[in-house]
Swiss-Prot record:
Gene3D superfamilies: alpha/beta hydrolase. Keywords: Aromatic hydrocarbons catabolism, Hydrolase, Plasmid, Serine esterase. Its EC number is 3.1.1.45. GO terms for biological process: catabolic process. This is Carboxymethylenebutenolidase 1.
Length: 234
């Protein structure tokens, strides 16, 4: 069952909306989904449906609520893509992490939550998933094609809970130097797994020109394998 009428209180006292996916069981782990730069789009809602079908509940907060509440942009429309990039440039990452922290707390307290919460993020959300992992805010964190992770590697030693990141070797946001930095630093932490696919940025979004079904299938299977650790023993 899906609902879009949820509100979460921020650290500053403001309230922001979230898209909720209720699990099909009375007790399930909750996945907090961190959006791409385009807002809570059909792709994000499809991701909620996928994870609910896999036995999880979902909370997807509107991370643009301070800048452009409830905005939904089409990555394939040039003017909307430019608008998304402008929002991303002005986005307050620290505020975004705090909002995810509030969403995680909200998720843990839901009546159908088993108390365990993961974060799964894409693009902007993939970078935020790394920050969540570095602060041990969730029980596990997963990022798809997170932007700028090579600038955050000083935080790798702080990651004490399972975290997984899916990256494309043809991602135009990831240089060869950035890839080397990520491989070197991520390899030093046993809690981290880094997976590379021969694809470009946004490879998991079905509407993207870079969409790759084979890579998405493998990445999503790995994601579900990690998330399964949060389920109640059968």
């Amino acid at each position: 069952m899906l609902s879009d009428g949820v509100e979460i209180t921020s650290r500053s006292g403001g309230r922001f909306g979230a898209y909720l996916g209720k699990p099909t069981t009375d007790s399930a782990p909750i996945v907090v989904i961190a959006q791409e730069i385009f807002g809570i789009t059909p792709f994000i809602r499809e991701t909620v449906e996928w994870l609910v079908g896999a036995g999880f509940g979902c909370v997807c907060p509107d991370l643009y609520w301070r800048q452009a509440p409830n905005i939904e942009l089409d990555a394939n429309v040039p003017s909307e893509r430019e608008q998304a990039l402008a929002l991303f440039r002005d986005f307050d990452m620290e505020a975004g992490v705090n909002d995810l922290s509030c969403a995680i707390e909200y998720a843990r307290a839901l009546p159908f939550s088993n108390g365990r919460v993961a974060v799964v993020g894409y693009c902007l959300g993939g970078a935020l998933a790394f920050d969540v992992a570095a602060r041990s805010l969730a029980d596990c964190s997963i990022g798809y094609y997170g932007v700028g992770l090579e600038k955050k590697v000083s935080l790798v030693p702080a990651i004490t809970r399972p975290a997984m990141f899916h990256m494309g070797t043809k991602d135009h946001y990831v240089t060869e130097e950035a890839r080397s930095i990520l491989e070197e630093h991520f390899g030093r932490n046993k809690n981290l797994s880094l997976h590379w696919y021969p694809v470009g940025h946004s490879f998991a979004r079905s509407s993207s020109p870079n969409f790759d079904q084979a890579a998405t299938t493998v990445a999503n299977a790995r994601t579900l394998e990690l998330l399964a650790m949060l389920k109640d023993p059968s």
